[in-house]
Amino acid sequence: PPADTLAEFIGQYVAGVAASMKRIVELIGDNSSPHDCSPNFYYFHFLSQVRMYYPGIRQKIEKIYRQDYDLWEKVIQKAKESGEIRSDTDVKKTAIMFRQMFLGLSYEQAFLNGLNVDELAENFRHIYSLLKA
């Protein structure tokens, strides 16, 4: 079921990321990398290759990004209207903070051990604590 609050949505989003990570590891394998790279690294490498060689992919990627930003904005707007978060919250900038926290951490950690989902959840909870009414 869809989340009723921003706090619930954050939990669902992190759970979705964890499930996706598990699928990536199942597809790529874990600890079998000849180059000591995390599965996340191969995922970003694959996306880079797709971006370079797949015709028309830019528009598809833009659409996927837009859908994710729209989803965050919708949930944040609802949280603002319900009084869950502060009334002076900038919905668009807040959506950007959550989304780019996820992408930035994912990219940075892809070059190390792969995305630490617990750290992502902790960072999301911190952003949420700054918004809480």
What are these regions (language model features)?
Residues 1:
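Helix-turn-helix
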Residues 8-53, 99:
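Helical hydrophobic small-molecule/effector-binding pocket
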Residues 11, 15, 35-45, 55-81:
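Amphipathic alpha-helical packing segments from all-alpha helical-bundle domains
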Residues 12-27, 70, 74-81, 96-133:
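C-terminal peripheral helix-coil segments that are non-catalytic and often amphipathic
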Residues 91-95:
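Membrane-interface starts of transmembrane alpha-helices
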